[in-house]
Amino acid sequence: MNSLEQAEDLKAFERRLTEYIHCLQPATGRWRMLLIVVSVCTATGAWNWLIDPETQKVSFFTSLWNHPFFTISCITLIGLFFAGIHKRVVAPSIIAARCRTVLAEYNMSCDDTGKLILKPRPHVQ
């Protein structure tokens, strides 16, 4: 394979990698917004739950029953983590990191957008 074909292959790989990472961005943004909203709801519900004087006087489950906003948002947050939201909000970074690991064997790397970074060849003497 000559150097022109190799350059074309590298450009095609870079185009596909940047396209894939770029396509992940909208979904990642939506997952991040969902995580932020549910986290804020859980924090707000927890604050209201903690400052309620009735919380100390009743049992734990009765207290949760009296604060459905906190209970539902907490269950939702736990469900989101079981569904893997912690991986979905950083999916492009995971893809880029895995590509860097593989590309390191070929003296290459990539940035977070998928652009290839060619490193100089080590001189063997």
From Swiss-Prot:
Cellular compartments per GO CC: cytoplasm; cytosol; Nem1-Spo7 phosphatase complex; nuclear envelope; nuclear membrane
Annotated keywords: Acetylation, Cytoplasm, Lipid metabolism, Membrane, Nucleus, Transmembrane, Transmembrane helix
Main location: nucleus
GO molecular function: protein phosphatase regulator activity
GO biological process: lipid metabolic process; positive regulation of triglyceride biosynthetic process; protein localization to nucleus
Compartmental location: Nucleus membrane; Cytoplasm
A Pfam family this chain is assigned to: Tmemb_18A
Residue intervals passing through the bilayer: 33-53, 65-85
Protein name as annotated: Nuclear envelope phosphatase-regulatory subunit 1
Source taxonomy: Eukaryota, Metazoa, Chordata, Craniata, Vertebrata
